[in-house]
């Protein structure tokens, strides 16, 4: 579908990328224009000009590239820093100073009387060797940063000045051709002057992280409210906000907490220009930004004159803010600020790495929003606390990603359900009027304020929609301007160029269009954005006279409302996909009536689907049974009542309980008392379809194993389902952790020489690695080398988080940045005393093979009880267990594919059926003779039978006696049923030369009865089909009947209906008959399944089926109870 916005591509993700890139480029141009205007105007700058700027057309925005380049250069290479620290730029080869801030000599080289023996204090200037400024430990640590690809892993580095003895945090980042180092004074009263490292910073955020992780999920609002509350308590700022960017780049204060007496900004929307694109780019590079005092005078940077380009300050926290931003802060009385970027995954399905390949390229990221802290007085936050806030923002981003996935699933399910309901309404009436006049209707498909349908030169309107004449005018405009497109979406009819937009007012701003034909069109309408937005902040007191040129949040909000005055909320990609899907269904429904139906091709597709699906499922099922019986891991299964119906040899060996002794016993009697509630919960959830993973419980031992103590299992609960996805039991795939736990217990008790255990090549020793309290890898045993391919000397003394494990540029690659954040949380929690056990973990080994495992982390303490690091134990499931899980997954995927295929086929069949119905209805009005009309009626009956069968696909278990197969009672003539049923086997009879003889009396054929004629027709056709299939070539099939009337009262008669179908030959195989009578527990054949369903239908009619086999002949005897139709009483 086309759009008034930049052209859309075929996929949602590419459409999003293109429109987003176009918006960013346009916004950057506007940012540069406004910046130039501000610099030239100074105090006379009129802030309201951004309204006119954002309304300017693309042609008016051309010719500004020079301003854009100058603006970006000024933002990134401004040569000014904030005065709370100083800055040095070092040449990477010589380690000499090539640039320094004007305050650096005073901060780093001033002589202190507390430091003796400083005869010749060092001087700081261009070319100074930085080793001369600091004591040896700090200078060595700084020089070590030269060899690191990612120098940020070392931050902060603690250094001490030679002259004053003052400690500083050195925060290093790499710029083009040099290292840029921020130096921030350490305040011993606030933080201990030790090389704390990143792990110590994680501790500061532990409480906040735990609070976020404990949230149930499903509410973005609750998640944002929690994070602002935790940051508020962690940092002590006066105001903390969660600031969210919308699709059109404008921002919204989504959550907020303030100290008492401060005006709230909750619900306030800002124009996109309030946070320029250049600033957003810098937030992607440097995810924490601090401004200590907006009134403080910036400090200049002195650079080596030999430098060809100014040094980039993108990664520096000290980078001075732009004067325009400082003015804005001053106006809103925010003297200090701290901002954390919230970076999330792009919504692109194609970027997901495969399960067995390392992620060669990280998933694309985007800036979701910011966590913004404001303070009404100068405020400095030390680096360790800023780092903790950055990590907290990363954890928050992981949960935002989860919320997106959950919202996407809920949204897709809702849209799919609505599409299905609308499709069903369409197929019943084959007219688009049904989805406008009925309930639900097209307004329920996507969020809108009104809708309309132009069909057959008539107009139908729903709620807030233009008048009939206006809709016709819009349709004419579409045909003239967008005649070649199949539709259009715009958030502003005015911007899209519709000449009548002004007459529509602000209640009709946005529109989405789907063309069914060139003259038949569906419309959706939206009102202006302001109607959707409410500011939750303080109301504006009319006595407050705001200067319209003064930069302030209230004026930002006013400017935003002006910008979006004639705009609606934008139409999202998923909404346009839903509209496009409905458009295709409508076009198919109306157009297929005019196209010939490829019935034979459809039959072949269905046949191939059944054969492929059954063969695959049978193979998978056989493999599952074999695996369960022979697996070297414990596997047990229970039915829906908790009774054991599966107990393999491995679990029998571990527990001492034989298979025959375990079968039939309740699972709760076989587990330790301490595990009863755990297993009970697992069983309950699994039967509801909620499968728990990595749950530990203890199994009782019996016989010779009784004295060995309980068996400790870590179990995955898998719901056992039938072909119709109905949960019929639970399978527990387990891993024996008894020996593993004994080793871990013994290990954690050892206080002295533990290396003998760690480096023992005994296969019982699991892979173990460890880190000291500063995050350096300190342990890596033989089993770990075998698992990963990385030797001990290649990882020891490297940063565990960042160099050994990371999602890029590390020895052991993780799948994603989210996985890296989770590993950080686990290790941090262990250092804080919350040890992790059997957490799901995965990594790529040296050869790129992905390893799924469990991770347990324990803290390491010395004799004084001081935490000195962590030990991490990895447990890898056996090959048999992994194979079993993969087979189970394949089975589930096959069942899902089959269900999806059947759902598609059902959907696809309805469209040609609608076309056939239209064709027959047209034929009836062409003057057919009696015989031709009779054939048309037979086709109608067969059509209704097929519709009935398609509707049965909704049944969970169609073969169950208690299934919800229903009867639709109506009057019919038995002749119509018999003729329609026989017609369904005549082609098969002709192919085998079989004669069908209907020896039915006139009285039977003309009898009018009351019941479900279509179901009876289905039953007869099933038994006739089987009879013809198992008759010899040249044989015969004879149909005879008997009717017996029984009077019940004066005007009610019941008819005992009996029909006999006799055919020659050996007859139907006994196996199929056993399946019909449910005497065979094997998977039923197609014929057995159809006869079983027909038998259940006969039972609903108070009837049954019998089969008689005689010499050379077989007979089906069908009985049912019908009511004589009122018009037939007395005949």
UniProtKB/Swiss-Prot annotation:
Organism (species): Sorghum bicolor
Membrane-spanning parts: none
Signal peptide start-end: none
Pfam families referenced in this protein's UniProt entry, alphabetically: GAF (PF01590), HATPase_c (PF02518), HisKA (PF00512), PAS (PF00989), PAS_2 (PF08446), PHY (PF00360)
GO molecular function (one): photoreceptor activity
SUPFAM superfamilies from the UniProt entry: ATPase domain of HSP90 chaperone/DNA topoisomerase II/histidine kinase (SSF55874), GAF domain-like (SSF55781), PYP-like sensor domain (PAS domain) (SSF55785)
InterPro entries: GAF (IPR003018), GAF-like_dom_sf (IPR029016), HATPase_C_sf (IPR036890), His_kinase_dom (IPR005467), HisK_dim/P_dom (IPR003661), PAS (IPR000014), PAS-like_dom_sf (IPR035965), PAS_2 (IPR013654)
UniProt protein name: Phytochrome a
Domain of life according to the entry: Eukaryota
Low complexity bias locations: 1-23
PANTHER family in UniProt: OS08G0260000 PROTEIN, PHYTOCHROME 1
Entry keyword annotation includes Amino-acid biosynthesis: no
UniProt keywords, alphabetically: Chromophore, Photoreceptor protein, Receptor, Repeat, Sensory transduction, Transcription, Transcription regulation
Post-translational modification: Contains one covalently linked phytochromobilin chromophore.
Role according to the record: Regulatory photoreceptor which exists in two forms that are reversibly interconvertible by light: the Pr form that absorbs maximally in the red region of the spectrum and the Pfr form that absorbs maximally in the far-red region. Photoconversion of Pr to Pfr induces an array of morphogenic responses, whereas reconversion of Pfr to Pr cancels the induction of those responses. Pfr controls the expression of a number of nuclear genes including those encoding the small subunit of ribulose-bisphosphate carboxylase, chlorophyll A/B binding protein, protochlorophyllide reductase, rRNA, etc.
The UniProt record lists the keyword Repeat: yes
Similarity annotation: Belongs to the phytochrome family.
Residues engaged in binding phytochromobilin: 324
């Amino acid at each position: 579908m086309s759009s008034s916005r930049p052209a859309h591509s075929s996929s949602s993700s590419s459409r999003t990328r293109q429109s987003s890139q176009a918006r960013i480029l346009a916004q950057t141009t506007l940012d540069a224009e406004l910046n130039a205007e501000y610099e030239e105007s100074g105090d006379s700058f009129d802030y309201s000009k951004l309204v006119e700027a954002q309304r300017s057309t693309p042609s008016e925005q051309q010719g500004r590239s020079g301003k854009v380049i100058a603006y970006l250069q000024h933002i990134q290479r401004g040569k000014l820093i904030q005065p709370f620290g100083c800055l040095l730029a070092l040449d990477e080869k010589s380690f000499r100073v090539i640039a320094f801030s004007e305050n650096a000599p005073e901060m780093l080289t001033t002589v202190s009387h507390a430091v003796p023996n400083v005869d010749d204090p060092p001087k700081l200037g261009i070319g100074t060797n930085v080793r001369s400024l600091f004591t040896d430990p700090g200078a060595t640590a700084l020089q070590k940063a030269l060899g690191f690809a990612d120098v940020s892993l070392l931050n902060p580095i603690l250094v001490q000045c030679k002259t004053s003895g003052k400690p500083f945090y050195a925060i290093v980042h790499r710029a083009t051709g040099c290292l840029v180092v921020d130096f921030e004074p350490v305040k011993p009263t606030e933080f201990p002057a030790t090389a704390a490292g990143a792990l110590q910073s994680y501790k500061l955020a532990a409480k906040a992280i735990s609070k976020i992780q404990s949230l149930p999920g499903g509410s973005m609002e609750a998640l944002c409210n929690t994070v602002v509350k935790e940051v508020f308590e962690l940092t002590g700022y006066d105001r903390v906000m969660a600031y969210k960017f919308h699709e059109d780049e404008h921002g919204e204060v989504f959550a907020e907490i303030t100290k008492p007496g401060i005006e709230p900004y909750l619900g306030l929307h800002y124009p996109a220009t309030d946070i320029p694109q250049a600033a957003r780019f810098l937030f992607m590079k440097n995810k924490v930004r601090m401004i200590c005092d907006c009134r403080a005078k910036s400090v200049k940077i002195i650079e080596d004159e030999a430098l060809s380009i100014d040094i980039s300050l993108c990664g520096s926290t000290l980078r001075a803010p732009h004067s325009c931003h400082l003015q804005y802060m001053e106006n809103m009385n925010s003297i200090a600020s701290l901002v954390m970027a919230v970076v999330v995954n792009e919504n692109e399905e194609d970027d997901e790495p495969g399960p067995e390949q390392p992620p060669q390229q990280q998933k694309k990221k985007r800036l979701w929003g910011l966590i913004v802290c404001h303070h009404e007085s100068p405020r400095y936050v030390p680096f360790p606390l800023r780092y903790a806030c950055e990590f907290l923002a990363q954890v928050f981003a992981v949960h935002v990603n989860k919320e997106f996935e959950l919202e996407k699933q809920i949204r897709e399910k809702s849209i799919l359900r609505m599409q299905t309901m609308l499709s069903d309404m369409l197929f019943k009436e084959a007219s688009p009027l049904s989805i406008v006049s009925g309930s639900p209707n097209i307004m329920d498909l996507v969020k809108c304020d009104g809708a309309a349908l132009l069909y057959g030169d008539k107009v139908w309107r729903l709620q807030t929609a233009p008048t009939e004449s206006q809709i016709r005018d819009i349709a004419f405009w579409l045909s003239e301007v967008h005649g070649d497109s199949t539709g259009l979406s715009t958030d502003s009819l005015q911007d899209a160029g519709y000449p009548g937009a002004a007459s529509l007012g602000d209640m009709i701003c946005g529109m989405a269009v789907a063309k069914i034909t060139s003259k038949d069109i569906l419309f959706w309408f939206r009102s202006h954005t302001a109607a959707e937005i409410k500011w939750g902040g303080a109301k504006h007191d009319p006595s407050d006279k705001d200067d319209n040129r003064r930069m302030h949040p209230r004026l930002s909000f006013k400017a935003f409302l002006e910008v979006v005055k004639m705009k609606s909320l934008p139409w999202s990609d998923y909404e346009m996909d839903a509209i496009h899907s409905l458009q295709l269904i409508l076009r198919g429904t109306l157009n297929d009536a005019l196209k010939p139906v490829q019935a034979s091709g459809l039959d072949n597709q269905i046949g191939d689907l059944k054969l492929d699906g059954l063969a695959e499922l049978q193979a998978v099922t056989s493999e599952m049974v074999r695996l369960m019986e022979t697996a070297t891991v414990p596997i047990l299964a229970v039915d829906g009542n908790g009774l054991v119906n599966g107990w393999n040899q491995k679990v029998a060996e571990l527990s001492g309980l034989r298979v025959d002794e375990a079968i039939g016993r309740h699972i709760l009697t076989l587990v330790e008392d301490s595990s009863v509630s755990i297993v009970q919960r697992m069983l309950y959830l699994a039967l509801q379809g909620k499968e728990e993973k990595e749950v530990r419980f203890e199994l009782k031992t019996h016989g010779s194993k009784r004295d060995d103590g309980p068996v400790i299992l870590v179990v995955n609960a898998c719901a056992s389902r039938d072909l119709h996805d109905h949960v019929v039991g639970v399978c527990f795939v387990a891993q024996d952790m008894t020996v593993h736990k004994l080793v871990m217990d013994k290990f954690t008790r050892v206080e002295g020489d533990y290396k003998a255990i760690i480096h023992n090549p005994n296969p019982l020793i699991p892979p173990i690695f460890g880190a000291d309290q500063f995050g350096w890898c300190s342990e890596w045993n033989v089993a770990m080398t075998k698992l990963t391919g990385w030797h001990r000397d290649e990882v020891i003394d490297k940063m565990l988080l960042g160099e050994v494990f990371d999602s890029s540029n590390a020895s052991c690659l993780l799948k994603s940045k989210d996985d890296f954040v989770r590993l950080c949380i686990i290790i941090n929690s262990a250092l804080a005393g919350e040890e992790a056990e059997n957490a799901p973990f995965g990594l790529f080994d040296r050869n790129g093979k992905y390893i799924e495992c469990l991770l347990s982390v324990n803290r390491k303490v010395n004799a004084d009880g001081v935490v000195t690091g962590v030990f991490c134990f990895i447990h890898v499931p056996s090959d048999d267990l992994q194979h079993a899980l993969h087979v189970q997954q394949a089975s589930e995927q096959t069942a899902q594919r089959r269900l999806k295929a059947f759902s598609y086929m059902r959907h696809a069949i309805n469209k040609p059926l609608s076309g056939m119905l239209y064709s027959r209805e047209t034929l009836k009005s062409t003057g057919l003779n009696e015989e031709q009309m009779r054939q048309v009626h037979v086709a109608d009956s067969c059509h209704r039978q097929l519709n009935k069968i398609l509707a049965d696909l909704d049944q969970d278990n169609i073969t169950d006696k208690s299934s919800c197969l229903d009867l639709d009672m109506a009057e019919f003539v038995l002749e119509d049923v018999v003729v329609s049923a026989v017609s369904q086997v005549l082609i098969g009879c002709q192919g085998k030369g079989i004669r069908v003889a209907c020896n039915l009396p006139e009285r039977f054929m003309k009898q009018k009865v009351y019941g479900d004629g279509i179901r009876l027709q289905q039953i007869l056709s099933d038994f006739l089909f089987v009879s013809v299939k198992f008759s010899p070539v040249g044989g015969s099939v004879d149909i005879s009947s008997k009717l017996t009337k029984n009077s019940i009262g004066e005007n009610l008669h019941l008819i005992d209906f009996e029909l006999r179908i006799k055919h020659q030959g050996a007859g139907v195989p006994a196996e199929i008959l056993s399946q019909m009578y449910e005497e065979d527990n094997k998977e039923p054949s197609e014929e057995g399944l159809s006869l079983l369903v027909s038998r259940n239908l006969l039972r609903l009619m108070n009837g049954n089926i019998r089969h008689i086999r005689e010499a050379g002949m077989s007979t089906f005897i069908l009985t049912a109870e019908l009511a004589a139709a009122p018009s037939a009483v007395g005949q």
